[in-house]
Amino acid sequence: MALRNAGESVWHLLIFKSIWKESIRNEFIRKESIGKNLSGKTGGDIMPAIYAHDRFGAKVSELVNGQLKDTIHAHYTQFQIGLQGPDIFFFYRPWSKNKVNQYGTHLHGISAYPFFKHALLVVRKKGRGSKEYAYLMGFICHFILDSECHPYVEKMIGETGVQHLEIEEEFEKMLLRMDGKDPISYPNADLVPTDEETVEAIFPFYHKGMTPGIVEQSLKDLKLVKRLFRQPTAAGQAVINTAMKALGQYGKMKGLMNQRTDNPLCKETNEGLIQRFDDSVEIAVRMIESFDESLTSGKPLEERFDRTFE
C-alpha cells in the first residue's frame, strides 16, 4: 500500500507540474491574442467538468426526437464520450508537453466551424445511425455548454478572484449533490470508456495525424487522472493538497480535486452556471437538429458553429 501511495504521489507531482506550466503558457497566449478571434482567447481551460458535461448530455438526449434519439440510444457510450469534446486530448501523457495535448488546447481556441464542416463528411460516409454520429452529437453538446459558460466564468474570475479550476470544481460538487451523489467519492473515471469501438468512432473527426492509438491513450490517461484525483478520505486529500502547496500552486490547482470544504465565494458562480446550464439544453437540441438539417439537405452550417469553445 505504501509503495502504491508513493507511486501515485509521483504521478500527482508530474501532472501538477505539467498543468501548472500549461496554465502559465495559456495565460500568456491569452493576453497576447486579445482580438485575434471571436472570443479574444485561445483556449486551454476545461469548464465545466466531466460530470457537468455528462449530466448536460443526458438532458439533451431526452429532448431530441426521431432517428437522432435512436442513434444516441443505440450508441450511448460513444455519445457519452463525445460530451467531453476535444478535452480528452488535453490529458494525453499529461506529465509532459506534447503535440497531442497541445492539439487539444489548440482546438479549444479556434473556431469550431472547420471541425463541423469536416464532421459533415464523416457522418455522411458513416451514416445517420452510426456510432460516429452519436459521438458527434455528444461533441455538439460539449461545444454548446463550453461556449455558453466560459464567458461568464472568465467574468467571475475577475470579480471573485477564484481560479477557473476551482469554479469548475465547486459547480461539479453542486451538481453531484443535486443528483443525490457524494461529490467526494463519486467515480468520475467510470464515465470514460476505452473500448475499441469507441476509439474507432472518435479518430476520423480529427486531423490526418490522429490515430486510434493516440485516441486510446488519451482516453486511458484521462481515466487515470480522474482516478488519481478522486480522494474520498481526508488523509488522501491532505497528501495531494500538501503537494500542491509545496509547489506553490494550491490556489490555482486545488480545483483538480473535489475538495471536502466548499468555497463560499462560489455560491454566486454556482447560481450563474446552473442558469446557463439549464438555458443551454434547448440551444444544444436546436444545434443538433440544425446540424442534421445541413447533413440531409446540404444547406450551410448555422453561423452559431463559427465560434470557439471560449
Annotate the PLM regions.
Residues 141:
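Aromatic-lined, polymer-binding surfaces characteristic
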